Regions:
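Beta-sandwich interaction modules
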Residues: 31-38, 70-113
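Short, surface-exposed beta-strand/strand-loop-strand elements in extracellular ectodomains
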Residues: 51-71, 108-112
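Polybasic, low-complexity nucleic-acid-binding and compaction segments
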Residues: 45, 49, 76
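Residue-level recognition of well-ordered beta-strand positions that form the cores
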Residues: 44-46, 57, 98-100
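Structural beta-strand segments of beta-rich domains
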Residues: 39-43
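Short proline/glycine-enriched turn/loop motifs at strand-loop junctions of beta-rich domains
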Residues: 48-53, 102-103
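Transition segment at domain starts
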Residues: 1-37
Length: 113
């Protein structure tokens, strides 16, 4: 089956007032949704001047409530600009990104599976 690549969190720029902002992305289908057996997922984080954390959350629920989500990968940075990759494995039904930050810009978070 061909791999899928999609942006799960698009551009977000902090207003620059040092407040803590939280952005939770939409639900995106993971390998478990499609019945794939390998469960391999890769995310690409692309950010500039970011101070904060980006967490990838997953769920096994087909109609998830807030309590159904758990963390599978987190990066925490202080005033950093880079493109970074991470891999994780699991037959997750849905995946989403959660951004908590006090400065900077997230250009995108891309999911490949």
């Amino acid at each position: 089956m061909p791999s899928t690549s999609e942006i799960i969190l698009s551009a977000n720029t902090h207003p620059g007032d040092s407040t803590t902002e939280t952005v939770t992305g939409s639900n995106f289908k993971g390998d478990g949704y499609y019945g794939r057996s390998d469960g391999i997922h890769t995310v690409q984080y692309d950010y500039a001047g970011l101070t904060g954390s980006i967490t990838i959350q997953a769920t096994l629920a087909t109609t998830p409530a807030d309590a159904d989500w758990f963390d599978v990968d987190t990066i925490t940075v202080a005033n950093l600009t880079e493109v970074k990759y991470a891999n994780f494995t699991g037959n997750f039904v849905y995946i989403r990104a959660k951004l908590v930050y006090t400065d900077g810009t997230v250009n995108s978070v891309r999911l490949n599976h």
